[in-house]
Amino acid sequence: MKAFMDKEFMLQSPVAQHLYHTYAADMPICDYHCHISPKEIYENRRFENIAQVWLGGRQPDGSLAGDHYKWRVMRSNGVPEEYITGTKPDRERFQKFAEALPMCVGNPMYHWCHLELRKFFGYQGVLNGDTAEEVWNLCNDKLQHDDSMTVRGLIEQSNVAFIGTTDDPIDDLAWHKKIKEDPSIKFTVAPSFRPDKAINIQKPGFVEYMGKL
């Protein structure tokens, strides 16, 4: 039986395999829309565990950060919000996500997660509720001890040449300035205009925000 995912994943002909491995695989990536924090890029954050990478959560300033596509998977499967953006322990939050993931076979999220596990962590299995513990331990060991698994390290491993962060019009771009002045950062990081707060007139705080703008 063919493996669920191997190096020829989605490459269904010899021509596709040749074109990808010979030309496309090593091409630099220009990511014009991402949610990586410029502060975390500059400070080269090291994540403590895979839940922090994948699920994010409530930040010290009260804001939320994380992959809302993964949150949607959990919500669609009836996971209580306290495990998604709440204060439950990261291990429990990851368990809930792992249990929900098999329910979205056919959704790109299922493939994205397994591609990431293979590329960055060398995990060849399938993530579900039963394998969550071994995946948790494997990923956390690499995140905590491998110097290539910091924010900058992951970007460099992915051969990213350009990152466009999503920024509010009133951001002072202080972290972008620091990044530009740091010669150790070899890839380009630039802000992009995302005025969500200026058009969400129905949300609390709109008037105060417009005053700042």
Locate predicted features:
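Metal-cofactor-binding active-site regions of metalloenzymes
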Residues: 1-213
